[in-house]
């Protein structure tokens, strides 16, 4: 613009057009310049286009010329082509290829050009601008609901069976299994009774001789007290029965009783089926084996149901038996003069008045006793005169059974002794007779017997014992013992020769233990001749057991009484410990001898059972009317939701599942109950309706305890209330400690309070390639370090119970035998066959959990056999076990494919196997290999030990809390834990703990974990990368891209399912406002979510449901592809953005906001013992009290004025942070006070949250602190809770019985002389040897020491196959021959051996003879040979201790006598 023109214009006064003119001029110049430029570019473009078209046309002309030249050359070579024909086949081929080429071009254009191509290009550009990512989410686990049968009970019934017959069948099942002909015979005796409301079914003084089954209506059973009041015991509904099994024994033994206190009355119109007990008597006459089995079942029910319920749960011990002496006909040295038949002895026992044991009157029998042989007990000899006081009208066949009777002896002492003593001395005739007999005995100078005296405390002593054997002819004592035991067994005089060879005598000093509780070897029937025995039982109350380690006294056994009949009839171990209370003499018969007598005289079981019943207290008889024994098949419901709660249940065997139905119809598992658990007790006590439905997972047995009986016992015995309060307090305390973490939306099924302790485990192979036998051996080896365990295979079961044991006729015997094995072991392993055999189906029915074993590096497809497993056991929990060879160093991968193909699997395990598992060997070589492996100590850190602890409910969990850079201390603590020998079975973490825990679960090597953690910490110190990640702080300060990259580089695309150790992380779901537990999915994403601290990182969006997840420490700071959930667990709010879950879209933040130490979550997932490491920061609680109001200007003045004292007042961010961690602090306090968690906090408070550069220093602090901490725990004895199972010495043979010692004794088989199932088939014996390819002939095979093989097994020796057992038999026979040679070559010792030593040697020889006889009858059984070896060793020891030549000669003479007696008996 010209300045002069502007000045002129301004001088002329027209200022309004100056600026507009200048602007127009400037614009016109610019437009002109631009137009010239566009014209130049346009011209250049036209010239370029013309040149391009000319070039393309020139190229086309050149190509045409070349084609013409090539055609001309072809024409010149082959002549004119116009005469050639284009065949149809060639034409079709030519045009087909041409069309396909066009289709390819068209499809290529669709993906490379057009609208779709442009749209994708725009989307790619938008992602670059908006930092979006392509949706290439990895494979995720399918969320499949369990099948309906898993949570629903079976409702359908049996329509083919009439209701009356069905109720009849179910009711008499308590007597055992009856075959169809016998059942039909029993049905012929049934009667139908129609009762109106108010009618009596039976009342007091009515005969107790029937079984009543309610077909319709309801019956009330109540008792009458002495004061005239009544108390209801139970209400019998449709299908239930009213009977007393103890009365059943009374009727069969010929002593029918009457109802003393029990009455049954109809509540409404009812129809009742009556089955007289005499009907069983008719059946038993033709089928003695059925009688034996019924008596055995009744005794088993008495021990398992009555004693279990009253003792373990109600705290009753001494109240269950008669503490006073049972009055009966007793003879301490009775001879054949006063002997009676079995009928007379039984009637005298039942109907006779109280008897008094008087001293011996040997005046008249001394001479005859000296002159006659007493070997057989049939001649006359010395007898004991037993007198009775006059009958008392107040005492008859049985005393009154009422709960109102005074408690006889709660402390175990005999209060009734003084009364009995007063009866003896106070009654004139009896007192005179007593003194006369005493004087007559005192006048006997040449031969005196042991005088039984009654001391003031009620015990019976033998003043001259034990030296009395020097003055009494032992043959007279032997004859007296034979006659007494004959009467106790109900045998006649003619049957004395049957038991005489088996009766043994023993002199006891005070405090000599005859048998201990749980011992199955030394079971005998003991008869007290002189002195007193005391019966004890261990204290079931854990608190009292710690305070008082002595056993509890139950009752005394006085002269003339027997003990041991219960264990003899049940065939199980002794339930009591029996000791001598004073100098005593006893006569006893061993179990093997009793069973041999039983084969000839089956009815002795009635007398043995009657002896057990006589000892029981009136309380037990009344409980027998009320307690029910319930059998439930799989799927049957015990009770249903909203039903009335009038009883509680005790699980005797099997497994129960509790399911709650929500108002919307959704079902959820509440809990599971195993053997010994109490079900429904809370609803019964609070008198509320059932809150859940409880059903049987597998075939189960339960004891039903009615509310009426429970109330009656409470009123009579207040100790029951104390026991119940203690039981419920422990249950409520445990529920309070686990309540907070059980209801999380993200928690799986395992998060419910389900008991992960199994009694039976079935092992099923997926394919034939799975080495199932070595796998079972390895698992068995690891379980032996925890407790007694048993391994069962089809071969072992057939070896023990016979080849036809899986047939339907042997159902009772097989079931009882398996139940006995489960009772004796903490866990039983059922190794299934590779096909769906009868044994495999039995394993499915018996299993609490099924382990499906497969090879992790093979195909994940589901086989046909595996689908049948799910069909047969729909309600049984199934877990997948994947095996990996150690040599390949392979890591688990593709686990999601395995789980998605098997929606019925609830949990999976990765197991790293040693080389020997995958070595292909014959069955015999495998057994020989593991016979040596079992001698070694198992590795507590192996995957097999981890699986063993999970199955037994002893898993050890490690919880790592959040704390930023202070999390480096976790690495040092991990190293200290490893050096302390503490195994880690489960890992959970929050925030930085999620990262460190995931590294440990992935690598399991402390060196590799340290290196990766150090590299990640170094990346976090590179601030320039963090500066590049800054973004506009709307949601967070950083975008999170670089942070995600660091976590993804650490883990890669690994899923949580692929980790070696079970792992979980916890995040805060800000979409649903709760914490979430992640046990599957992308690892790095959920670790990132758990580290998303608010304000720094944006929440992670959960890809499952779209929820926003933050750091889980906000709610619980100690708790797909792995890195995603690690990233989600580290999403610090405000620093990193929340992580969006790829499954549901929820936003996830750091888990520290809800639970910074999720030990409660770990406990709910099944960990029994937990180590929780907290590295979080601690808030300052010492704040300034500024009054009612606060001025910010005053705070500013205090802050900037250096001459004033500083004040501690939280600022706004600090207040927001404290509010966010309110839930976390409360959760942390509950964890510190729990009894299942060991809370540890290293001294790392001086380090800041972002001090990642001090990684090594913080790690060393954690290591030093952890090492000292665990050393102090070991010194204090508190470290055993984490590795107590592996500090035991190798189990010894004497403490762990072999397989045959645990064999179920079927008395019915003994009585009816069924074919022996122990016989070895020669063809079967060598069939397996042929498959061994000659390995059995190796010299190391037959030289294996049997005892060396049995040393390492804490359980039973069921883990050997038939071949190995047969080799043991051969070895036993060789050892036996060596023993015989060594015994014969033993030189005689000095002739000064005492008479007592001679008698003990004779008794030992008697034992040896009985075992020898058992070997002959068992036809080579392993049990007999093992017992024979033991007896031969004891025989050898006895000979070494000083048995002279005279003693050996006497023993040889006794051998010949007994052998001749045995031959006569056998003929």
UniProtKB/Swiss-Prot annotation:
Keywords of the record: Developmental protein, Endoplasmic reticulum, Hydrolase, Lipid degradation, Lipid metabolism, Membrane, Neurogenesis, Phosphoprotein, Transmembrane, Transmembrane helix
- Entry EC number(s): 3.1.1.5
Membrane spanning stretches: 35-55
Listed binding positions for a nucleoside 3',5'-cyclic phosphate 1 are 174-301
- Which terms in the Gene Ontology molecular function aspect does this entry carry? lysophospholipase activity; protein kinase A catalytic subunit binding
As its record notes, the protein acts as a catalyst of:
a 1-acyl-sn-glycero-3-phosphocholine + H2O = sn-glycerol 3-phosphocholine + a fatty acid + H(+)
Bilayer topology annotation: Single-pass type I membrane protein
Q: Where is the composition biased (Polar residues)?
A: 1382-1393
Q: Where is the composition biased (Low complexity)?
A: 339-350
Q: What does this protein do?
A: Phospholipase B that deacylates intracellular phosphatidylcholine (PtdCho), generating glycerophosphocholine (GroPtdCho). This deacylation occurs at both sn-2 and sn-1 positions of PtdCho. Its specific chemical modification by certain organophosphorus (OP) compounds leads to distal axonopathy. Plays a role in the signaling mechanism between neurons and glia that regulates glia wrapping during development of the adult brain. Essential for membrane lipid homeostasis and cell survival in both neurons and glia of the adult brain.
- Name-wise, this protein is Neuropathy target esterase sws
Instruction: Give the species this sequence originates from.
Output: Drosophila yakuba (Fruit fly)
Q: Taxonomic lineage of this organism? A: Eukaryota, Metazoa, Ecdysozoa, Arthropoda, Hexapoda
Gene transcribed to yield this protein? sws
